[in-house]
């Protein structure tokens, strides 16, 4: 993907590496990346290019154990991600008038946990995890373990994503039951991680617009996929 040179500023918020994309504006998008990604992932770069052209500023940051924080050893937990997203939101609200969200994969899930009661203008989700418990159950089946075995082992490593029992308990205790923000969702037709029926159920329940890219995957990384994502965004950024 050819990347344009953008106006960006590297800062730290409570020690967390952050990039502010674009010039000061009265509207800002808070962006949360997915697993094995970072604050400068291709999809966030595309978002920044498209959003800046529409007059937005974008804030992206590295989640625990990602990007500049790969040295961290503590298992990434949802409650810590919620805490950090709230820090970013507080910063954004001090520097702009309207805050919107972008979330990719698990980043979208953490935003769902964090912002159900916040003042949010608009939301754009790419390949969002809308039901983390189902994904964990799918991984448990893949690893051929029961919940009882999982509880005893606490951590189960595999070739997809490690399973951690306290994470699972948190997910079960924090279901997504409220989401009233105007939300646009893009997923790939062949996304096997966030299955169609799960995402469709979420979209129907909370009145979200759902778009599929034909032959698309969970990870939007090819030029064709990113071009589709860019066009989709540009039609929905106002």
Feature map (PLM): residue ranges:
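N-terminal cap/lid segment of alpha/beta-hydrolase-fold proteins
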Residues: 1-24
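The alpha/beta-hydrolase serine catalytic core
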Residues: 4, 118-201, 205-212, 216-220, ...
């Amino acid at each position: 993907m050819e990347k344009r040179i953008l106006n960006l500023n590297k800062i730290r918020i409570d020690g967390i590496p952050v990039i502010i994309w674009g010039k000061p504006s009265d509207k800002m998008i808070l962006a949360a990346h997915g697993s094995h990604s970072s604050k400068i992932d291709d999809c966030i770069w595309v978002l920044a290019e498209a959003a800046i052209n529409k007059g937005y500023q974008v804030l992206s940051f590295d989640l625990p154990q990602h990007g500049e924080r790969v040295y961290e050893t503590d298992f990434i937990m949802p409650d810590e991600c919620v805490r950090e997203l709230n820090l970013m939101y507080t910063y954004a609200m001090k520097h702009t008038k309207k805050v919107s969200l972008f979330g990719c994969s698990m980043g979208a899930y953490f935003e769902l946990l964090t912002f159900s009661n916040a003042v949010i203008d608009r939301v754009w989700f790419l390949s969002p995890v809308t039901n983390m418990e189902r994904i964990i159950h799918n991984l448990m089946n893949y690893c051929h373990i029961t919940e009882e075995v999982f509880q005893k082992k606490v951590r189960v490593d595999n070739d997809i994503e490690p399973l951690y029992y306290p994470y699972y308990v948190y997910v079960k205790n924090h279901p997504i039951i409220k989401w009233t923000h105007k939300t646009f969702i893009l997923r790939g037709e062949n996304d096997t991680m966030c299955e169609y029926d799960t995402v469709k159920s979420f979209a129907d329940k909370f009145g979200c617009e759902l778009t599929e890219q034909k032959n698309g995957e969970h990870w939007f990384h090819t030029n064709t996929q990113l071009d589709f994502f860019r066009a989709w965004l540009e039609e929905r950024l106002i």
